[in-house]
Amino acid sequence: MRVNVVGAGPAGLYLAILLKKSNRRHQVRVIERNAPDATFGFGVVFSEGSLDELQRADYESYVAITESFASWNPLDVRYRGTTTRIRGNVFSGIARKELLRLLQERADELGVELEFLREVASLEPYLESDLVVGADGANSLTRRTYAEQFRPKLGAHPAKYAWFGADLAFPVFTYIFKETEWGVFQAHCYPFEAHGSTMVVLISEETWRRSGLDEMSEQESLEFTQAVFQDELGAGHRMLGNRSLWMNFPWIACESWHTGNVVILGDAAHTAHFSIGSGTKLALEDAIALARACARWKENREAALTEFEIERQPVVERLQEASRVSADYFASLQRYFTFEPLQFAYQLMTRTPRITHNNLAARDAEFVRSCETWFWSQAGGAAPDGRLVAPPPAFAPLRLREVDLANRLALAPVEDWGAHLRAGAGLVITPLVAVSAEGRIDPTTALAAELPQAPSGGAEVMVSIGHAGRRGAMRPRRQGVDLPLAVPDRWPLISASPLPYAPWTPVPEAADPARLVEPFVEAARQVRELGYRLLELDFSRGYLLASFLSPLANRRTDEYGGSLENRLRGPLAVLAAVRAEWPAELPLGVAYSASDLAPGGLTAADSLEVARRFRAAGADVLRVLTGQTVWETRPEYGRTYGAAYSDRVRNECGVPTIAFGQITTVDEVNTLVAAGRADICILDR
């Protein structure tokens, strides 16, 4: 087989090695525009798990690479004048130039033809070979040439970052967070040789502009950034530059990775944010998978390339999603700068769903025990009864006004909620209880006056009252969601505007704002008379009050429509009136949709403003939901998918939150509450 590989980065060189190793008769050529010793950046990092694949794929290069590693186990977090160390994070670093040299030597040893200083302006001269491999990086000529076939999706993360070096070896992988007059500067630092480290510095675009970095030369930028981190570098040490330009991280994802005899891999096909340290790992694993597929299918090139895609794309997509979560986390890190150092380090380590409380405990049990003890002391106001070991965070108590919840677990909405009071959750939230007969979802929806007396013992019950609005007069949901009753069985519907919820549902009348408040106040009074101590107002999921909040459902031209201030007027009037009716010592919650998950819906900024206004009007806890404002919702699913919204609301608005969304284990609850992303979590059953 004749193979032309465009690009002599790690992916291209490693693929050439593996192809030539699998069959010495293969004619493998690597074409590179730069000199063999030219490289940008400083070091690359590998996790412990990624080395197993390299060992199996080519033991000779594995030995050469690992003998050049700088390895470490702990990880340091430097924040607010403290250093927190977390063990069990086994990583290794190597100079990028050294990695490329070792791969070049191995390729040359096997007989790979290496052509440096050759500019590839067109792929045309190389297409006569059996296989053309685009390993030409994020700015791939190969991908651009076949854009119609690869169908790339390109984007850029809003934060700015630059790669620097340092003339010292940090003892371990080190995160540094510095508050400056211009904003927060972050450095992700790792050693790659005896006297050298990589420092990736990350800042917001606002900080980049406020500091004047947007107008500085490369040398001026280097000197400025060194001054920011001089205390961490220490006297006599300095930062180093090598094309250390401020950039936005490029997002690259392609629907297809091959066409005909052309295939792309590594950064040419996909990128993953540097904060999860997987870019080089993904590139090398691409090479392993492609070489393996070619060896298995031999002359059947299409089968080999198809198998390569089928094997690698799901793996890459999962890591890309994790890297997006991680990138967004670092871009919004300032919201956590009120956290104590232990909790700050904990939430840093658990920033993606891949690392949970149990995972972290397996890495560093002592660190997790310290976090558990600290969390319990914060929740209970004192050490947990003098115990040597604190219970897990999910079982810490929570006080809302004068009501104490036994733990952070919730069940909701529970149709037969009375049967779940002793299931172990500290809180049980009822399904929507209608404030009037016209506010029911379906004929089986309970009215406040029909509730039983508040039970004694077991979990606390939060009664969720609301008005279904244009999602009312439906069949019971066991027959299907949002299916209208037969015409004779329907009751009149109201909404913020006369817009049907879905094309097949009835058109409601525009609600009279003057008649919004009293049904909620009366329902709250009835709930209290029955002895319940927790009440929630349901302003979510397209129900009546939610329709006032969302620009997708509210097209009014009076003082209750248009601006966010106007759209809030009705919900805030209800909240204020119910808060005045509900006893001052008892907590009042609000459920609201933090995102409509549909184009043109509530913006992220407006969503946070809504949460702040609810808090100011007397809401003690917010159940942060998403979607269902309109039937065209584009749902987001995945492990703990709703936690990010809860996190944002809790830590930017200063209000306790209830998180939802495929939270299925106590381990996940431990993780979310200990990290400060929620105060209570609804367990999916």
Name the predicted role of every residue range:
Residues K20-G41:
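Glycine-rich FAD pyrophosphate-binding loop
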Residues E105, Y126-F249, A253:
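Conserved FAD-binding catalytic core of PHBH/FMO-like flavoproteins
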Residues A35-E53:
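Conserved N-terminal glycine-rich FAD pyrophosphate-binding loop of Rossmann-like flavoproteins
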Residues R292-A383:
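C-terminal helical "tail/cap" subdomain of flavin- and related membrane-associated enzymes
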Residues A11, P36, N139:
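Conserved Rossmann-like nucleotide-cofactor binding loop
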Residues S370-R685:
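Flavin-dependent oxidoreductase catalytic cores
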